[in-house]
């Protein structure tokens, strides 16, 4: 199988928001103070980490992408420590230093991996003049692939509408992790990433997925957004866009130790992938995988490219996702031994559209597990022409792996998957389109093994060619 590419060295992201320093004191707690009914912590270790918008920048730098940080800090020790942390990670620090305010600092005291107390040192920036921040943004935004506005409600983004307009004029996507219930202030942004509590506080209670979709699409329309990503804790995340099917991703977290900074990780991975030119679905797939990693760490943490790559490549250890042929054989054998019916289909799946989603959902209903075999890039070129594929193999596989209806995704380099089908021998072989069963590649092998072969129609009015024509017409 071709390796999934996670090189982001061409991506450039600008982060503007509430910059913080996170301090951690770790110690042992074995007794109660004689002075008051509180635990006594014997401090054994201390750490300092970039927090808030600075943590977003750290996550981006961990992916080897170019990142610049804009914000407000104080002329103090915490500001100096933060500057050193940023320089050590090759982050361009364009924060404005103020004599009138301290650097926002949060001190957490922990024992046995439990947070006992948090002390906040801060003053609101709401009364600080925004023009220097706006001038720096206007001057430096050209050439960046995405702008993140990291809002913790501390006042750095008091002029958020002007910031959005500067980015829009420069044709730079604006991604915002929102704060509070006044989402109107984010009007015109490209994408918002509220968590479920924040989302429901704005749109009202959602009883099911349909409520999330309908209310989310209305919010997109009302605020003139391009997309909305609702992070749903143990239920994963849902991407919504006008004229696109909802894209639901189940959580990939195995163990949750600390959710501190998880939202920072999601938006940083999302923006980096978008700045790298990757489709929204792939960007969400990567962000979801990264969130599953970071909640397994203690405190404000980042996810690096190696960890993310391992999570993508080794998701197959759980029995699902992008797999090698050897592992697929193992998983299908185990599934058959459990009495599960294996369904297999194949295609280029160049630009995923509602017709594809509906087709794959219907294919999955024919059995218990669905395999999607995907043509490699060279195979697509031979079949579709030199201008195809639009999306790379890694992007196409990542998007398919994120669909709830798909269990396993595998690439093949030949023009047809006949050899792969003969190795896997699914119980049901499915192909989309106006085929007769005897015309479907692999039918003889499947029939000889006692399996079934079916053709399913695509949804009317949905085709990759039509999507490409619409995109070309916009240009």
Curated annotation (Swiss-Prot):
Binding sites annotated in the UniProt record for ATP: 195-198
Database matches in Pfam families: CTP_transf_like (PF01467), PfkB (PF00294)
- Which reaction equations make up its catalytic activity? D-glycero-beta-D-manno-heptose 7-phosphate + ATP = D-glycero-beta-D-manno-heptose 1,7-bisphosphate + ADP + H(+); D-glycero-beta-D-manno-heptose 1-phosphate + ATP + H(+) = ADP-D-glycero-beta-D-manno-heptose + diphosphate
Pathway it belongs to? Nucleotide-sugar biosynthesis; ADP-L-glycero-beta-D-manno-heptose biosynthesis; ADP-L-glycero-beta-D-manno-heptose from D-glycero-beta-D-manno-heptose 7-phosphate: step 1/4; Nucleotide-sugar biosynthesis; ADP-L-glycero-beta-D-manno-heptose biosynthesis; ADP-L-glycero-beta-D-manno-heptose from D-glycero-beta-D-manno-heptose 7-phosphate: step 3/4; Bacterial outer membrane biogenesis; LOS core biosynthesis
InterPro entries hit by this protein: Bifunc_HldE, Cyt_trans-like, PfkB_dom, RfaE_dom_I, RfaE_dom_II, Ribokinase-like, Rossmann-like_a/b/a_fold
Regarding protein family, the annotation reads: In the N-terminal section; belongs to the carbohydrate kinase PfkB family.
Q: Which HAMAP family match?
A: HldE
What is the name of this protein? Bifunctional protein HldE
Q: Which organism is it from?
A: Haemophilus ducreyi (strain 35000HP / ATCC 700724)
Question: Source gene?
Answer: hldE
